[in-house]
């Protein structure tokens, strides 16, 4: 199958006319004072580690199967004859995403659906022979993705990382119990609570949801990352910017294009290379960045509210090491 591009909510961010003094300093050519890195660190590192996981997946896993598709195969291999709702809860995916996955994988002959006994409106799911063969062929490669992702940590720190991420995501070890003999494979635990890639995805989904609650549609987290990086490193080019914010060149270019159109970023020719454009924040861009600071802090607070301050710092350090994999 081909790949396909997966507490109390805060008040959405409103547009405010107030300006931060740094915006005026920047406009006047003075020294700027961008927000502290820690305000955005968790979300940015989670996004980067998710991208590392996706890169490893593309490098190692054959056949064009996606991580969510394999997760469906894995769950149904461990617990056949569950319904679609139970599958979605086990994968931490919304109803629409699970329905689309199940429909496409059913059409591809990887899973089968049968009406549940005594409930004509409910279908149970299980792997077909083809689905079982595909799972068996992919499993060793998927295990390598998880092992490569955490290779920089070592066994002890990996265990610590998993425990911290279980707290962040509220994924409880032992909540997903296999009903068939588990496939014993180093790097591919039967319990998703011990799967680093799964925990990173669930945490990233939470961050995205919290960001929408707090900031709304005014500014996306990747756009904020670009503004923040340019506040800290004014005058870098687009290639350098993409590297700094851990985004592929094309998506980074689209973000810069949109922010430039909104008057929040400006491009100027490099005096030493006329073909190269240098990027800086405008006073408007700096003002927008400071407007989102309270909301960004609320996102981080919600995401890490069950961690102590020391645990949060430890998680940041571990995510930072994983982001360089």
Q: Model segments located where?
A:
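A short beta-strand-loop micro-motif that forms or neighbors metal/cofactor-
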Residues: 157, 161-179, 311, 318-325
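Charged, amphipathic alpha-helical coiled-coil/dimerization segments
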Residues: 103-163, 257-317
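N-terminal leader segment of winged-helix/HTH proteins
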Residues: 1-63, 163-217
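N-terminal positioning helix adjacent to the helix-turn-helix/winged-helix DNA-binding module
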Residues: 38, 68, 130, 157, ...
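N-terminal helix-turn-helix DNA-binding core of bacterial DNA-binding proteins
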Residues: 51-97, 108, 191, 209-249, ...
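Alpha-helical structural segments
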Residues: 48, 52, 77-78, 90-93, ...
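Short, conserved sequence motifs enriched in acidic/basic residues, glycine, and aromatics
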Residues: 48, 64, 81, 92, ...
């Amino acid at each position: 199958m081909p790949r396909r591009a997966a507490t109390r909510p805060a008040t959405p961010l409103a547009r405010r006319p107030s300006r931060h003094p740094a915006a005026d300093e920047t406009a006047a050519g003075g020294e700027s004072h961008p927000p502290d890195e820690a305000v955005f660190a968790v979300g940015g590192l989670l996004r980067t580690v998710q991208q590392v996981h996706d890169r490893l997946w593309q490098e190692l896993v054959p056949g064009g199967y996606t991580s969510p598709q394999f997760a469906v195969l894995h769950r149904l291999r461990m617990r056949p004859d569950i319904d679609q709702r139970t599958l979605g809860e086990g994968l931490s995916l919304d109803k629409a995403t699970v329905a689309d996955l199940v429909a496409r994988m059913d059409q591809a002959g990887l899973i089968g659906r049968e009406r549940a006994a005594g409930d004509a409106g409910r279908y149970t799911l299980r792997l077909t022979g083809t689905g079982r063969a595909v799972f068996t062929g992919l499993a060793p490669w998927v295990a390598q993705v998880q092992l490569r992702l955490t290779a920089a940590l070592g066994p002890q720190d990996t265990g610590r990382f998993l425990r911290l991420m279980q707290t962040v995501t509220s994924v409880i070890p032992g909540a997903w119990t296999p009903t068939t003999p588990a496939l014993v494979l180093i790097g591919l635990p039967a319990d998703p609570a011990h799967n680093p890639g799964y925990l990173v995805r669930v945490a990233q989904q939470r961050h995205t949801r919290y960001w929408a609650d707090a900031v709304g549609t005014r500014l996306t987290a990747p756009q904020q990352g670009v503004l923040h990086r340019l506040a800290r490193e004014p005058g870098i080019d687009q290639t350098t910017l993409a590297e700094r914010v851990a985004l592929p060149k094309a998506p980074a270019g689209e973000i810069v294009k949109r922010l430039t159109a909104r008057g929040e970023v400006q491009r100027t020719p490099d005096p030493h290379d006329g073909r190269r454009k240098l990027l800086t924040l405008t006073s408007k861009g700096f003002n927008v960045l400071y407007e989102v600071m309270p909301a960004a802090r609320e996102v981080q607070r919600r995401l890490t509210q069950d961690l102590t301050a020391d645990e949060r710092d430890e998680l940041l350090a571990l995510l930072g090491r994983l982001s360089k994999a």
